[in-house]
Design a protein with these regions (language model features):
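Catalytic cores of enzyme domains
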Residues: 12, 48-49, 54-169
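Non-catalytic, usually N-terminal nucleic-acid engagement modules in DNA/RNA processing proteins
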Residues: 1-57
Length: 169
């Protein structure tokens, strides 16, 4: 979990700023649950898919419950943001869509991790295994420190292991 004030979102991608969704937003809370390492080390990926779906629902339950607690305890207004859906649009053919926020950018702004060369969110403890959700609120919480970049400049592990060579240095 991490907290980020709106000053951290001045360079949010176009149409992905928290204030685009909730103009009175003063703070964003990012929540992440890590999948076990082993799920990324087995084939087929059916196990990963099964448990990732479960974790998505758990993250949604956490942000929903936490939003209600914050509204009660801090007399605030909260907008829980789900981990996966909904999308503004979804292109079935290309398997691409536009969500409500960039959860990776939210997590960076809230101090949970940094975006690596692979364009994945990297957390110092959990690597790229976090499933993320968020809460937008009008309560002005103190921001957590920004996470240090954990990418080793000379490292090319993600570039070398990309099966379609999509990652450029």
């Amino acid at each position: 979990c991490g907290f980020g004030g709106m000053e951290r979102f001045t360079e949010a991608p176009t149409d992905f700023s928290p204030i685009d969704l909730y103009p009175d937003c003063k703070s964003v809370i990012a929540v992440g649950i890590a999948l076990p390492k082993g799920l990324l080390r087995v084939e087929p990926r059916l196990l990963y898919g099964h448990f990732n779906e479960d974790v998505v629902h758990k993250v949604d339950e956490i942000v929903f419950s936490a939003a209600k607690i914050i509204e009660k305890e801090y007399d605030g207004i909260c907008v829980p943001i789900p981990s996966d859906c909904p999308y503004e649009y979804w292109e079935t053919e290309t398997m691409t869509g536009k969500g409500l926020l960039s959860m990776k950018h939210v997590a960076v702004a809230c101090g949970i991790g940094q975006i690596g060369k692979s364009s994945l969110l990297l957390n110092p403890e959990y690597g790229n295994r976090l499933t993320l959700g968020a809460i937008l609120t009008n309560v002005d919480f103190e921001s957590d420190p920004v996470c240090k970049n954990i990418c080793i400049p000379e490292c090319t592990k993600c570039l070398d292991s990309c099966p379609v060579l999509a990652i450029q240095d």
